[in-house]
């Protein structure tokens, strides 16, 4: 079952606004929230970073340059 997660990147210096993206992730049990499990949230975060970079024409190295080193994910209810 596909579950939607919102991936948000924050600038640690506070100079830039947060950027976010919605990512669909295939999951067996939709009632389980993967945002708490550190191992299982890594592919969700990676997909979100790739989608944000593609949307803004950035490379992955630019994220660190702009200070986007803090990440949060949350489950999006439909």
Which role fits each region the language model picked out?
Residues 10, 31-35, 46, 59:
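Short, low-complexity, intrinsically disordered N-terminal modules
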Residues 16-38:
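A short, exposed loop/beta-hairpin motif centered on an aromatic-Gly-Thr core
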Residues 4-5, 29, 57-61:
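N-terminal functional modules and adjacent low-complexity/disordered segments of proteins
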Residues 10, 25, 35, 74-76:
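A structural detector for beta-sheet-dominated domains
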Residues 3-12:
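A short beta-strand micro-motif
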Residues 40-78:
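Short, mixed-charge low-complexity intrinsically disordered segments
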Residues 1-4, 40:
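Short, surface-exposed loop and linker segments with low hydrophobicity and enrichment for Pro/Ser/Thr
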Residues 7, 19, 28, 44-47:
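Generic low-complexity segments that are intrinsically disordered, proline-rich and/or Lys/Arg-biased
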């Amino acid at each position: 079952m596909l579950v939607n997660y919102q991936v948000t990147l924050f600038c640690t210096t506070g100079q830039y606004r947060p950027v976010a993206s919605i990512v669909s992730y295939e999951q067996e049990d939709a009632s389980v929230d993967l945002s708490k499990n550190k191992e299982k949230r890594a592919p969700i975060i990676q997909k979100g970073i790739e989608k944000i970079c593609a949307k803004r024409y950035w490379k992955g190295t630019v994220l660190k340059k702009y200070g986007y080193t803090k990440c949060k994910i949350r489950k999006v209810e439909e």
